[in-house]
Amino acid sequence: MTNLIATFQDRFGDWLTALSQHLQLSLLTLLLAILLAIPLAVYLRYHEKLADWVLQIAGIFQTIPSLALLGLFIPLMGIGTLPALTALVIYAIFPILQNTITGLKGIDPSLQEAGIAFGMTRWERLKKFEIPLAMPVIMSGIRTAAVLIIGTATLATLIGAGGLGSFILLGIDRNNASLILIGALSSAVLAIAFNFLLKVMEKAKLRTIFSGFALMALLLGLSYSPALLAQKEKENLIIAGKIGPEPEILANMYKLLIEENTSMTATVKPNFGTTSFLYEALKKGDIDIYPEFTGTVTESLLQPSPKVSHEPEQVYQVARDGIAKQDHLAYLKPMSYQNTYAVAVPKKIAQEYGLKTISDLKKVEGQLKAGFTLEFNDREDGNKGLQSMYGLNLNVATMQPALRYQAIHSGDIQITDAYSTDAELERYDLQVLEDDKQLFPPYQGAPLMKEALLKKHPELERVLNTLAGKITESQMSQLNYQVGVEGKSAKQVAKEFLQEQGLLKK
């Protein structure tokens, strides 16, 4: 409990930001779902066959896993709030639509006949007594939708829409139960609060209910005003990073350097996703900059993959020229350290089976179980390369990056992929096996951005190239350890390092 409170106090500012994002997304989704579902239900009430079809279709959408729905929208809408909002609205429509139709159909037919006898139009009947009588049932559907929205909105973090899910995702990545609890408990409390508020509104008069939702819409609009005004004052760059502490540290370094040396501001989007996710987001303009590694560019982004040597300078030149020609992306100068892929095993396993090189795994491939990330498992410079170059046919379970270290620590797996600067190698006493057949190319990190952005702001090259040739492997490993193991803020670690190196004044 003490650790939970300390973590909450340390990250209170981040929590307020995440809570605000979650509230904005949830409230906007709920209001849009109400505006779509209730008028549709009023229309479908008099078209029973069509109503059955629409309800079935809406119900089918609810059976689609939310993560799959988000993934389907990314190619069409990019990343960020729009695909998250669209997916959440689709999920929220069904309970509101169903309850509104049920509520309207449950009205005593004699009241309908009396209204017609008094010469009331359909709209007058709806306004005078049908909606008021059906309102308790309608509000019940709205409450169900609200709870559903708030819970599902935690997944919006995976596509860059922010929210309380960022704490959960970060907690999983850092193996930090306090962060997970902060995100989960906040989401649960928010759902309970929404449910209570809507329950109170349910008992109010119709005009009071409408006024309540109008007030919500007004407050929602006002909450977006500061961000819109800030964007007009200064150009804001979106700097994203892959999952893990290292990309977040590098992204914060870029942000700090840009804000000190230019008139622009920058927002960091950490734990944004895998390589392909960030690459597509960059090309579509959903993000502006992210740190990418030379070997990843040559092996995964360039199509077809060029044949390169294992000389770092040559790999960088091929990556820089190839990505510029293929996608009109600018790849600035790399840092010094190599963060290559690696295959690691616990030291006691290495000693027990005499494992020193990746080739040595051949003699134990039937005895040991491997845990790889989805990305490593599908890459030519990953498990596919282990199969083709080393002839390995390992028993592989795929999992999220942070979970593989927990799995190897608990003994569920004995082999894992890693990055050579991962703090977990030291934390869990792992031994990196020698890449004796040189499967993994050099991996040096450098900022990747659109050529159009660099042409518009040429000062970015000068500012970000101050990191070129800087940061050794031991320094990067230590920075990762501070964030991943000691739990320090990536922004603070990045700031302290830049100040120590004389790259940042304040």
UniProtKB/Swiss-Prot annotation:
TM region(s), chain numbering: 23-43, 49-69, 70-90, 148-168, 178-198, 209-229
Annotated GO CC locations: ATP-binding cassette (ABC) transporter complex
Keyword Membrane on entry: yes
Record's subcellular location: Cell membrane
InterPro entries: ABC_Gly_betaine_transp_sub-bd, ABC_transp_perm/SBD, MetI-like, MetI-like_sf
Domain observations: In EgtUBC the transmembrane domain (TMD) and the solute-binding domain (SBD) are fused.
Name of the featured protein: Ergothioneine transporter EgtUBC
Organism: Streptococcus pneumoniae serotype 2 (strain D39 / NCTC 7466)
Annotated gene: egtUBC
